[in-house]
């Protein structure tokens, strides 16, 4: 039995699972997102280069990926510290920081935030989507990639002794690339050896989550300790969602607070609003999947922070939970979604 067995590994070390409390399972606290920059049309280039101020906030909120400063979340450490204190004051206990290699993971900043706020922070090992893979990453074998993932959990990430507590978010594109397929196989191999939690970022196709689970299963992964992120923008059809839920992984609705007319990263996708997300969560509960649901905001741009008029990390606790109660999701079920399910997922086998 591993020394990690029965524990959760945070950036400050091992903790008892019961200490976590209400947990957001997919957030970012320090990252850059230049890989998803969308150049604006020529007529909007000037506004895209302006600093974030009240008069252009509406444009940036509607074109989040066309404003380069907006993609530099790593510049807002002090604001994020204040938000984490607010999150804790509103009943929050822990969050999983999903930044991996390719989007500027910074475990030292995560450690400092955990020390200064008292919020349990779990860091992710792994690689983001193919567009961020280095030539070195592409050249690695599955065995070499497995070693990298395991090293992040057993010894430390980013050249530090600060250890990751999950593998992910593992980035997948659509269609899946060969490099991403190798990373998925390595993820399964590392999970099989460590008994660790895994979290996946699927490509923007309803077929992507099914393909990813199949690849993980064939490589020996434990699907019961695997999270499929971003289902709110990936599987929109009810029947297809319930078909996916049968596969046994965690279904994560992690874009709470994101309400867009036009989704730049997937123009064919009509991004649901929070009321639609709540209805999908309620559907999964009604169909018997309350033990397999997780929620979060996936904050990864500046304008989603309270400092810039955004909803912040406390939106689910302060706004979404009351609406869920109003829509018939019970306190007992909400405790499962926010406390028990994250605890079960994050605990090493």
Curated annotation (Swiss-Prot):
Bilayer-spanning residue ranges: none
Cofactors (names): a divalent metal cation
Binding site for a divalent metal cation 2: 169, 201, 230
Pfam family, one: PTE
UniProt keyword annotation of Cytoplasm present: yes
Superkingdom classification of source: Eukaryota
PROSITE patterns (alphabetical): PHOSPHOTRIESTERASE_1 (PS01322), PHOSPHOTRIESTERASE_2 (PS51347)
Cofactor note: Binds 2 divalent metal cations per subunit.
Keyword Cytoplasm: yes
Single GO biological process annotation from the record: taurine metabolic process
Enzyme Commission numbers on file: 3.1.-.-
Catalytic reaction(s) noted: N-acetyltaurine + H2O = taurine + acetate; N-propanoyltaurine + H2O = propanoate + taurine; N-acetyl-L-methionine + H2O = L-methionine + acetate; N-acetyl-L-isoleucine + H2O = L-isoleucine + acetate
A GO-annotated cellular component: cytosol
Location(s), subcellular: Cytoplasm, Cytosol
One Gene Ontology MF term: N-acetyltaurine hydrolase activity
Entry-linked SUPFAM superfamilies: Metallo-dependent hydrolases
Keywords, in A-Z order: Cytoplasm, Hydrolase, Metal-binding
Primary role: N-acetyltaurine hydrolase that regulates feeding by catalyzing the hydrolysis of N-acetyltaurine into taurine and acetate. N-acetyltaurine has anorexigenic and anti-obesity effects that are dependent on GFRAL receptor and GDF15. PTER also acts on other N-acetyl amino acids (Met, Ile, Leu, Val) and N-propionyltaurine, but at lower rates.
Similarity remark: Belongs to the metallo-dependent hydrolases superfamily. Phosphotriesterase family.
Protein name (database record): N-acetyltaurine hydrolase
Native source organism of the sequence: Pongo abelii (Sumatran orangutan)
Species classification: Eukaryota, Metazoa, Chordata, Craniata, Vertebrata
Primary gene name: PTER
